[in-house]
Amino acid sequence: MKTLLLTLVVVTIVCLDLGYTRTCLISPSSTPQTCPNGQDICFLKAQCDKFCSIRGPVIEQGCVATCPQFRSNYRSLLCCTTDNCNH
């Protein structure tokens, strides 16, 4: 009986996903994607280049381990730690 119980516990541990994985949007029109291990922060970055006045800001979204540093050509930068928060 103890062997059966121990076997069930081991199988349960092996089959379960023990680590929680974050999901973030990778592009404005994408469905949420699972982030790689260690990248638990979702981000949304809007930055301008020389064509910003014509086509608008360039949007970049995804998963990161640390929030990117804000730069002068960014219109906005959002870092968040809940699923799909970077929309």
Swiss-Prot record:
Keywords: Acetylcholine receptor inhibiting toxin, Disulfide bond, Ion channel impairing toxin, Neurotoxin, Postsynaptic neurotoxin, Secreted, Signal, Toxin. Pfam families: Toxin_cobra-type. The lineage of its organism: Eukaryota, Metazoa, Chordata, Craniata, Vertebrata. This is Kappa-bungarotoxin. Changing R55A: Loss of inhibition of neuronal and muscle receptors. Disulfide bonds join C24-C42, C35-C63, C48-C52, C67-C79, C80-C85. Shows very low activity towards muscle nicotinic acetylcholine receptors (IC=~10 uM). GO terms for cellular component: extracellular region. Changing P57K: 13-fold decrease in inhibition of neuronal receptor, and complete loss of activity towards muscle receptor.
